[in-house]
Structure formats: C-alpha cells, structure tokens
C-alpha cells in the first residue's frame, strides 16, 4: 500500500492539541480539524486506545507538508511505543479513512495514519467509551468522557 500520499494523522487522546502530549509534535501542522473514524474507543486510565469496531470515534486531524511526514512519523512512533520491527508493541500505526467537515459544510474523506491498540487482550478489562457526542449527524465517542482520568503531567501516566 502506498503511504507516500498520506500527510495527516488522526489522533484521539493525549496527542490532541490541548492535552499532555499535544506539545510534543516535532513539526508544525498546516491545520488541525475535527474528524471521525469508525472505531471503538477504550479508556486505559490516563490515556485511551482505539480498536476496530462498529462505533464512531471523534478526534483531530493534524495535516502536514509531505516533507514533514518522516520526522513526524518517527517521533510519534516513539511516543506511541510502536516499532514496525518489533512484535510486542503497545500500539500499531495504521491507515484510516477519516471523515471531516469539508467546504460548504459537507462531509469530506481523507486518509491518515492513526495508532490502534496492538494488544486486544488489554482491552478486555478496559472501560469502553460509548458515543455521547454528535459529529456529522452521527453519534461519536470521544476521550475524555466524564469518567476519564486526564493526566496533567507525565508522572501521572
């Protein structure tokens, strides 16, 4: 699969701009917009994890210049504990189709990288976050919800 045409990340947890890791991005994005993917969302305590599922998950799309993608991928892989050469990762990087609000308030689709839980067994004991918001006319889940514990420092993770 060709990934050279992808210049965006979909994030849904501590990498969002107003959260703990939102300031760790190595490059400045061209824009940040709301978007949703089809996925289930789980609360792992101080951060969430997504897994393939039937619900919709609300997050942010961070779009970059193509020239900024390699260093951004390298840094985010490190932050998310993903190494494509290792078997026991916490997360795995995948390509997703994201729906955003496009021109004239019409839904628009784009492809982006996103990190998903690499160890589904961990999710068996995690709290599933149910949809509680609406985006593009459909119910969506989002992190944090009213029961989530949001870390304010790295020592709280």
Where are these predicted regions, by residue range?
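Glycine-aromatic micro-motifs
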Residues: 2-157
